[in-house]
């Protein structure tokens, strides 16, 4: 009965979400409007805490207005695309707000990218300017002669509090701003709900990074529902946000949610398990936007005085695995863990509205779990050629029907968007978004008859590591670009004690003894971000393919780097090294006992 009455109390928060109507496409519902509304109400309240800085809503709004006017005077118009390549800090937020105020599109670049992936993201976006933080100027400088933004006036450099000098090829942004010209802009009145707010790059299911299109209405809908039914915070709360703002979790579930209710945000460049609870007490962070990996790190820390009586009461995020959930919630006395599930490019959101355990919750969208053959990497169909639904609690491929209430914005690349759509699934003419994820239904007890779900795994050509989606095809192309590597087969493998899957690659060599591992290691380091670098390399005799020449991954994935199953030579990349070395049983034992440091 206790659970029944608790659930009745949840109803008052759930009903507004179920009744929520998306903003009219032509209405003035944008991130900029939401921010300006909160500024009017809470002008002198803290907006952002960062290192030794505190910005009020009023200060941030004035800075964003000055920046927006500079952009307009220098040719940036409604609908133009502008690259934002900077670590988490106040001027990242101000830059994003400035762009939104004039209807420009922020092209949010992963700060770990270098080389070809960085070139691709910039050039494929067709951006006219680039805002670069001083801390990321070096990787941008390395590719200047290969990107389509070359004019000094279009490369806007933003100083950091570290000792960086202004590059000769860039313009010092802050020294060119008129901070006296800081009133709200008329241009903001022309920004609508349907306008694109930003591009967030995702590897999707295959190939190079693709730009997912996020309109203002998607940011606002997420912010409204997450704060109402998720965090349940208001303007007196402070959110702990150490996730990268170029990702949808840190941006949509974190920053946008805080802005919607006028709350404060404590932002960090990067997560630190050792200082987490000290920071939480210092800034009285009552809410936390998370990914599961961070929770595992915190739970693996030795108990400390700082974690006791901590202020965090509610958390919203994704990827918290069942084996960590209970331990984390009990140890740190967190009242609400609101796990969500969704994709930047996707058309629906799952949310654990009822604060149940070990579930991504429910959704208002029309969804189906399709029978899927993992070994053959294909959807199973009936004799009529239509897909078959899972009829029990077994995992199935999650598909979400595309319709007026579940719009698929997709990517800027129309061909890539089409590849994510399943057609004629249950009847001729229907269309469903293929998430590429295996999901199952779970019994969570009394839930007003609402079906609840749990994430199981990713399928196909993508795996997730260090909270990043990694495309096996993209990594494979980089590896194949090295001399003596003819064809590599890349896949994700589980590492004990770690979230997601780490990269592993298999390839054959004509001359194993004379293969230049130092040069290969350097090639990997220079061309792949750290999260995408394969941690394990298996040297095989011959590449195994299907009848249609698709690389077979299933057996390789199952054998992983287990030396008891693998007769081939396996090399590994240790956490403190950038060079591959032979995997021996001593290091394998450390990995299996969760003492390797991955």
Model-derived segments and their meaning:
Residues 23-28, 33, 44-89, 93-97, ...:
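Conserved AMP-binding/adenylate-forming core of the ANL superfamily
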Residues 489-496, 504-508, 517-598:
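Conserved C-terminal "lid"/linker of ANL adenylate-forming enzymes
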Residues 113-116, 120, 130, 342, ...:
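AMP-binding/adenylate-forming catalytic core of the ANL superfamily
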Residues 157, 178-201, 208, 231-238:
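Conserved pre-ATP/AMP-binding loop-to-beta segment of ANL
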Residues 1, 6, 73-74, 97, ...:
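Structural core segment of the AMP-binding/adenylate-forming
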Residues 56-58, 190, 197-221:
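Conserved AMP-binding A3 loop
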Residues 260, 282-290, 299-373, 407-408, ...:
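Gly/Ser/Thr-rich phosphate-binding loop
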Residues 220-238, 246-286:
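Conserved AMP-binding/adenylation subdomain of ANL enzymes
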């Amino acid at each position: 009965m206790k659970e029944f009455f608790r659930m009745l109390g949840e109803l008052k928060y759930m009903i507004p979400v179920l009744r929520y109507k998306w903003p009219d496409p032509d209405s003035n519902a944008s991130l900029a409007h939401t921010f300006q509304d909160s500024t009017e109400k809470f002008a002198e309240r803290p907006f952002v805490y960062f290192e030794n800085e505190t910005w009020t809503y009023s200060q941030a709004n004035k800075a964003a207005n000055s920046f927006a006017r500079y952009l307009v005077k220098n040719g940036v118009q409604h609908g133009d695309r502008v690259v934002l390549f900077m670590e988490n800090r106040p001027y990242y937020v101000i830059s994003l707000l400035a762009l939104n105020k004039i209807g420009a599109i922020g092209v949010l670049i992963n700060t770990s990218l270098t080389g070809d992936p960085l070139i691709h993201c910039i050039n494929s976006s067709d951006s006219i300017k680039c805002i670069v933080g001083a801390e990321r100027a070096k990787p941008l400088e390395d590719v200047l002669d290969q990107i389509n933004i070359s004019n000094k006036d279009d490369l806007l450099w933003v100083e950091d509090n570290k000792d960086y000098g202004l590059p000769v090829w860039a313009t010092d942004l802050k020294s060119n701003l008129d901070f006296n010209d800081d009133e709200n802009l008329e241009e903001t009145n022309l920004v609508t709900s349907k306008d694109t707010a930003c591009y967030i790059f995702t590897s999707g299911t295959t190939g190079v990074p693709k730009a997912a299109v996020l309109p203002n209405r998607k940011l606002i809908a997420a912010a409204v529902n997450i704060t109402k039914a998720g965090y349940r915070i208001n303007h007196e709360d402070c959110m702990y946000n150490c996730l990268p703002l170029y990702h949808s979790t840190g941006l949509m579930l974190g920053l946008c949610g805080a802005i919607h209710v006028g709350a404060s945000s404590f932002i960090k460049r990067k997560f630190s398990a050792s200082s987490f609870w000290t920071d939480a007490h210092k800034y009285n962070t009552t809410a936390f936007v998370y990914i599961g990996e961070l929770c595992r790190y915190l739970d693996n820390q030795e108990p400390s005085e700082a974690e006791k009586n901590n202020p965090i009461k509610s958390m919203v995020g994704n990827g918290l695995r069942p084996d960590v959930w209970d331990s984390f919630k009990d140890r740190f006395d967190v009242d609400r863990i609101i796990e969500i599930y969704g994709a930047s490019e996707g058309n629906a959101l799952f949310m654990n509205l009822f604060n149940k355990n070990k579930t991504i919750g429910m959704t208002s969208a029309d969804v189906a779990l399709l029978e899927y053959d993992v070994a053959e990497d294909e959807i199973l169909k009936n004799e009529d050629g239509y897909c078959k639904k899972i009829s029990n609690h077994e995992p199935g491929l999650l598909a979400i029907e595309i319709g007026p209430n579940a719009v698929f914005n997709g990517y800027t690349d129309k061909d890539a968007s089409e590849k994510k759509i399943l057609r004629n699934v249950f009847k001729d003419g229907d269309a469903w978004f293929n998430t590429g994820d295996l999901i199952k239904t779970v019994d969570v007890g009394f839930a007003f008859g609402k079906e609840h779900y749990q994430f199981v795994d990713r399928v196909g050509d993508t795996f997730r590591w260090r909270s990043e989606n990694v495309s096996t095809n993209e990594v494979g192309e980089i590896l194949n670009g090295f001399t003596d590597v003819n064809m590599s087969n890349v896949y994700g493998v589980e590492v004990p004690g770690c979230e997601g899957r780490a990269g592993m690659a298999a390839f054959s060599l004509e001359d194993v003894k004379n293969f230049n591992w130092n040069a290969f290691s350097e090639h990997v380091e220079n061309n792949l971000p750290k999260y995408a670098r394969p941690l394990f390399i298996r040297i095989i005799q011959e590449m195994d393919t299907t009848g249609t020449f698709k690389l077979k991954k299933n057996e390789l994935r199952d054998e992983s780097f287990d030396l008891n199953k693998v007769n081939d030579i396996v090399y590994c990349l240790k956490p403190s090294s950038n060079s591959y070395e032979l995997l021996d049983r001593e290091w394998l034992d450390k990995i299996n006992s969760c003492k390797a440091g991955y």
